[in-house]
Structures are given as C-alpha cells and as structure tokens.
Design a protein with these regions (language model features):
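N-terminal amphipathic/basic leader segments beginning at the initiator methionine
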Residues: 1-38
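Short acidic-hydrophobic, aromatic-tinged amphipathic segments that line or gate anion-handling sites
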Residues: 33-40, 116-120, 326-335
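Glycine-rich phosphate/diphosphate-binding loops that line cofactor/substrate pockets in enzymes
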Residues: 41-59, 79-85, 222-229, 256-258, ...
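Short glycine-rich or small-residue beta-strand-to-loop segments that form or flank ligand, phosphate
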Residues: 53-64, 88-93, 231-233
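C-terminal non-catalytic interaction/assembly regions of soluble proteins
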Residues: 78, 88-90, 246-247, 251-360
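A glycine-rich helix N-cap at a beta->alpha junction
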Residues: 103-124, 286-296, 301-304
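Conserved, well-structured core segments that form the ligand-binding/active-site neighborhood
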Residues: 110-226
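Glycine-rich phosphate/diphosphate-binding loops and the adjacent beta-loop-alpha structural elements
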Residues: 196-206, 226-245, 255
Length: 360
C-alpha cells in the first residue's frame, strides 16, 4: 500500500501530510478555485453610469479571489474614460486586522493609492436614520464588491452585516432589518458578489437574497459519519495571520467530528494572537467583550469540553496549553501521529479544503 499526499495552505506557503492508503480518508472541498463569469458582469454595472459621475467601489476583502474582479472593475472605469479623481476605492475587511489589510491592498492597489479610503479614516454622517460613511453618501454611483463565505460565529453574513462589521455603516443594522433594506434601496447600491464558482451582479435588491441562499447551498455540507480527526487550514495568508482571525474555523468544523474527536487546525498565525481585547479574553477566560474574535473564542472554549483541538502553528506551545489546553505542532505529520496515538489507524480522517459549514 502506498501513501497519498494532502496539501494545506499555511501562511504564504503550503505544507503537506503523507497518509497511508490503509487509513480511511474522506476529502471534502468547497474551495471553488475557479470563478466563472462573463465580462458582461462588470460592463453591465457601468451601463447606466453617466460621464462625470463620482464612483465609490466598496471593496470588502473576504478572499483572494475577488482581487482580480476589483482590478477588472478599475480597468473598466479607465476604459470608459471616467475621471480618476472621481473614483474612490473604499477598502475594508472585517476578517483580518486593519494593519494587514493596509499592507496587503496597499501593494495591490499601488497606482490608486490616492483613491483609497478606509472606514476608520473618515467621518460618518446620518442618512435615512443610520450613520453612513461620507464617501458612500457623497458618491453618485456605489458599487459593492465582495464574496459571501461562511463564518463560524455569524453563519452567512449578509451584505448589510459586512458593511456594518467593516465600519462603513453605523452599528444599528441587523439582518432582515428594514433599516438596511431601506438604506440599500435609497442609496441605489449596486454590487458584484462572488458565491462559490459563480458571480452575481446588478442592484443589490435584485440579488442579495438569492446570493445568500446560494452561499448556504454551496458551503453547507451534510455529513454522514462524524470523523475521529478533521484536518483543515484557514486559507493561508492573510486569513491565518492571527489566532483571533483563524479560530472561527473551529466552529465551522465542529459538526463534522465526533464527541471526543480531534480538530486539527492548520494556521500559521505569523502575526501572533490578535488584538489586545482578544488576548485579554484568552488569558483571563472572561468573555465580556463583544468583538467577533472574543465570540469565536467563547464558542471554542465551550466546545473544548466535548472535542479536542490541536494546531499546526507558529504560536508557542506553552501559550496554547495554558490558554486553550490544546497541543501545538510544527508539522501536520506530527499532529496526525498524535491523532493516531489517540484513535489508532482505524480512525476516520476528514480533510477539508476551503471554508465549509459541516452539519449532521
């Protein structure tokens, strides 16, 4: 019997594990590496835009896949002769911290440095009963660009959720809120949204609901047998830059592993643990703060009574033992060997490629 190699994203590189063919392995993929779309997805957005109108592209960075769409969108703005000084690139991400966002996209968008606006760099003003960033209100054309992906605390965040979490609109918005629907329609928000291997575009009111339903169809995976061991990465850099931003993946996986089973999280955490608020919660085991990272941590802490967690990470082992009572390893091979010591080679190993919500 031979060995099969399985690869995982780890920071800016990839790491692999060799698993003997006599082990029961089930591989799941929701990575949808190819996004299929016709250029008309982009061109039709601008068909109703008049020359001289000011344009805001609200780019909410959620995966490495939408950067190419952003570049195509900017190329279309240029091809149609719209003035560069009328373009604003409203750039945000609630899935990674602001310093990493600025470094990542500052590089990608270098020629457009002067057009970039971050949510924390400008004032909000009241519009239709909600606090909204000035650049959104002051622009005549508003185009949202992102992906819908599952999140271990939020499930499937709506576009309204993502604008709120990123800081473009005030905190009063909740899902299904009439407030958001009214704002969406009054601002005539347009959008391009990636879901799995497909792309939606047009006015948000035309496709937002369908787009959320499609995300649930594509990323929710029903599991027949709960595994003894799950191995999953967090998407590599920048999504695995800190423990705070990676931990929600544990919650996505917990439905796919049996009680007493092991979730093996492969997350480099090159930038360490995360924000001060998160670090305080991690060491004090108090979860008063309402941040997304702390909510993910609380869920993981609750889960650890029933399931085990181990990590392949750059975070010192002593910290993982002290805070999460979990083991840290240098390689996926070492983590798996540890798993086999607990469950023997008869274990069912589930390998998950991409973000997925596992349910029974």
């Amino acid at each position: 019997l031979g060995l099969t190699e399985y690869w995982f994203r780890y920071g800016v590189t990839e790491v692999f594990v060799d698993i003997s063919d006599e082990v029961r392995v089930e591989k799941l993929s929701t990575a949808y590496s190819n996004v299929r779309y016709d250029y008309s997805v982009i061109s039709k957005i601008f068909d109703g835009v008049a020359e001289g109108e000011s344009i805001a592209i609200i780019f909410d960075y959620a995966s490495n896949r939408e950067v190419d769409l952003l570049k195509s969108l900017i190329a279309e703005v240029e091809a149609r002769g719209f003035e560069k000084n009328k373009l604003k690139l409203l750039t945000s991400s609630w899935r990674i911290n602001s310093k990493i966002l600025e470094e990542e996209l500052g590089e990608v968008l270098k020629p457009y440095r002067g057009c970039i606006v971050y949510p924390w760099s400008e004032d909000k003003t009241e519009y239709s009963g909600v606090m909204v960033s000035r650049s959104i209100i002051d622009s005549q054309v508003r185009i949202y660009l992102s992906s819908i992906l599952p999140h271990g605390v939020l499930g499937y965040p709506s576009i309204g959720d993502s604008l709120r979490l990123s800081g473009w609109v005030g905190n009063g918005l909740v899902r299904d809120d009439d407030c958001w629907l009214k704002l969406r329609d009054e601002l005539n928000l347009m959008g391009i949204c990636i879901v799995g291997d497909g792309v939606y575009s047009g006015y948000l009111y035309e496709f937002e609901d369908e787009c959320l339903r499609d995300a649930e169809r594509k990323y929710t995976v029903k599991i027949k047998d709960e595994a003894d061991i799950i191995l999953v990465d967090c998407g590599g850099w920048p999504w695995d830059s800190t423990l705070e931003d990676s931990l929600h993946v544990v919650n996505l996986m917990c439905g796919g592993v049996k009680d007493g089973g092991l979730i093996g999280l492969i997350s480099e955490c090159r930038e360490g643990l995360g924000s001060n608020v998160f670090i305080k919660a991690l060491f004090s085991h108090s979860f008063e703060e309402d941040s997304l990272g702390v909510k993910a941590l609380k869920r993981v802490a609750d889960l650890l009574g029933r399931k085990k967690l181990a990590l392949v990470t750059a975070i010192p082992r002593s910290i993982l033992e002290k805070t999460l009572h979990s083991k840290g390893f240098d390689t996926v091979q070492d983590l798996l060997t540890y798993g086999f010591r607990m469950y023997s080679k008869q274990a069912l190993v589930r390998i998950v490629d991409g973000l997925a919500w596992l349910t029974k």
